[in-house]
UniProtKB/Swiss-Prot annotation:
Its main location: membrane. It is found in: Cell membrane. This is Energy-coupling factor transporter ATP-binding protein EcfA1. ATP-binding (A) component of a common energy-coupling factor (ECF) ABC-transporter complex. Unlike classic ABC transporters this ECF transporter provides the energy necessary to transport a number of different substrates. Its EC number is 7.-.-.-.
Length: 280
């Protein structure tokens, strides 16, 4: 049995521009994502992370190389609907993904288009809204909700399609801190409680701390790969790429440089407090 949800094999993607040289946005990427994994892809603007993510449910097809989703080649047109049913996608702006005037109708939109029976749709909509803690808002108009609530409705709309994997392309970029926290908690729960494979594209380091594994992209290539502790403890390399690290990791780095004997892989405030309390 194939343990991988998504496999990228020597993937190259070129943006073809009229009268200009084509721009390589993804440059020979090899990446396997396991079923049930929570993977974060980090990178600054223009690193290729969003372009790569759009290959993971066949929104884009590679110029060279192959992408497999649940063992299906994205270049095979007969696989497209199965792939998009298996791997849902949530974008930055929830307003661009909401199509109905009532929350529960919006969540029902995807299953209706799959031709699913009304009783089954009702069941899926209720279940999806409960999973994102938005069931009590099912009869609200989406435009009356906060940004974080709208994004959770967009996630519910994907969940109603029963995907095995959800790709989040900077889903908190347009949200305030409280909305961001709501959405990140929802993403974590979908992974931990329901076993859904999560691929989160972000530039917020505090979100990346929650991942099983982090991939860092720069100039279309994967330049680092490892656990959050392995990635963030390498502060000079992250800074060199143009990325920040979590505040507590940066503080640990500065304390080390000042001669304080403290671990370099501290990620959270609690870990920092514990480390400082153990100093003599």
């Amino acid at each position: 049995m194939n343990e991988n949800m998504i496999e990228c094999k020597n993937v190259v993607y070129k943006y073809e521009k009229a009268e200009e040289e084509s721009k390589v946005a993804v440059d020979n990427v090899n990446l396997d994502i396991k079923k049930g994994e929570f993977l974060v892809v980090l990178g600054h603007n223009g690193s290729g992370k969003s372009t790569l993510s759009k290959h993971m449910n066949a929104l884009l097809l590679p110029s060279e190389g192959t992408v497999y989703v649940s063992g299906m080649d994205t270049k095979d047109e007969s696989n497209i609907w199965k792939i998009r049913n298996n791997a849902g996608m949530v974008f930055q702006n929830p307003d661009n993904q909401l199509v109905a005037t009532i929350v529960e109708e919006d969540v029902a939109f995807g299953p209706e288009n799959l031709g699913i029976a009304p009783d089954e749709i009702r069941s899926r909509v209720d279940e999806a809204l409960k999973r994102v803690n938005m069931y009590e808002y099912r009869r609200y108009a989406p435009h009356l909700l906060s940004g974080g609530q709208k994004q959770r409705i967009a996630i519910a709309g994907i969940l109603a399609m029963r995907p095995e994997c959800i790709i989040f392309d900077e889903p908190t970029a347009m949200l305030d801190p409280s909305g961001r926290k709501e959405v990140v908690n929802t993403i974590k729960e979908l992974n931990e409680r329901y076993g859904i494979t999560i691929i989160l594209i972000t530039h917020y380091m505090e979100e990346a701390v929650e991942a099983d594994r982090i991939v860092v992209m720069d100039k279309g290539k994967i330049v680092m790969e490892g656990t959050p502790r392995e990635i963030f403890s390498n502060v000079p390399l992250m800074k060199n790429i143009g990325l920040d690290v979590p505040q507590m990791t940066e503080l640990a780095y500065e304390l080390q440089n000042s001669g304080v004997n403290i671990a370099s892989d501290i990620l959270t405030i609690d870990e920092m407090v514990n480390a400082l309390c153990q100093l003599k």
